[in-house]
């Protein structure tokens, strides 16, 4: 509100010259460059907050009721630092980083000038989500192979597993379906378990030196899936992947998985005579049902 921009396009060549000036009526306090003095961190601020505990870490002050977030987690995302000049880009990066933490619902930052000096205190207010979440999802499946049936997914989420905004998510899924062909009923069911653990930083940190402004995350996923065609075979699948995610802006996101492992197997004891005969008559199909162990990398 205190800056004007004048654009001059007379020069042509599809170019514009921009002249940025500060308005004459800008108050002195808005012209003054401020240096950050102290930083006050409220890790879970609520209107009903009564008693708090304040812990000093140099010029950082953690103000908390339950100490639900470790100081290192908050400091890692504070780009406004004591002794440095205030910059709006640091403010925007701080808000973006804090809002990306799974436990954080809302971020608010206030500034308090210190007396008549050019020093500024920064006050960070975080409001948290509920740490634990449970959900159930029900669906129905209709396949082109005439299989149909109900399915369900139960999810458990911990948004602050070790007080460092780590995300733990567990999915338990199941499905039952039948196939109707010429009056015959062919049943099948599927069960699966998937566990995902996510850190709001790179681990180990020395592998990728990208910086906290890119919202780094480390993810580890492992899962097991069982598919049982009761009249034909039983398919077991194990998979795991370890990788990193980061994004310098809201439009571009990078995902790099240096380790991806998939193992599938059909136990011989689960194969019916009818299924074995079908595989012998169709060698091309048989290869798709062979035991597979796949290791890869993706970006």
What are these regions, as identified by a protein language model?
Residues 101-105, 126-132, 158-167, 204, ...:
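Secondary-structure transition/capping motifs at alpha-helix termini
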